[in-house]
Amino acid sequence: INIFGMENEFLQVIINILNNSKDEFERKEFEKKYIFIDTKITQDEIIISIKDNAGGIEKEVINRVFEPYFTTKFKSKGTGIGLYMSKEIIEKHMKGNISVKNENYLYKENSYDGANFLIIFPNKQKIKVN
């Protein structure tokens, strides 16, 4: 997938999401730690999914993760602006959409729970999908 424009900012969004997964892995003990990055192109959209198996985001806070200065981490670990800035970059500057949901999925016949961040851009080139 080629996404043109704002490469550094887009990379920062990916890093912010990966850092949150890493921080959650450090808070809990996991035998196996997974982060999956999947991409899909449809006639209308370019979809990027980033999911982990760090247990997901608590129901009480999942709707707040993109708010400025919201954090569940100790002050020395997070400022609460990483995901807020990620949303600003994706939605205001790159004209896409970013969301998060908790998801249960299978991998190698094992069940895992984690957060799944979806980044969706319009497919302006209308690439044909077979």
Where on the chain are the PLM-derived regions?
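Conserved micro-motifs of the catalytic ATP-binding
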Residues: 2-5, 72
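Glycine-rich ATP-binding loops of the HATPase_c
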Residues: 94-108
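Short alpha-helical Gxxx[C/S/T] motif in the catalytic ATP-binding
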Residues: 82, 86-87
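Detector for a conserved hydrophobic position within an alpha-helical segment of the HATPase_c
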Residues: 90-91
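A residue-level detector for a conserved hydrophobic packing site
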Residues: 10-14
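Acidic ATP/Mg2+-coordinating residue in the GHKL
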Residues: 52
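Short conserved segment of the HATPase_c
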Residues: 57-69
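Short beta-strand/loop element within the Bergerat-fold HATPase_c
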Residues: 32-44
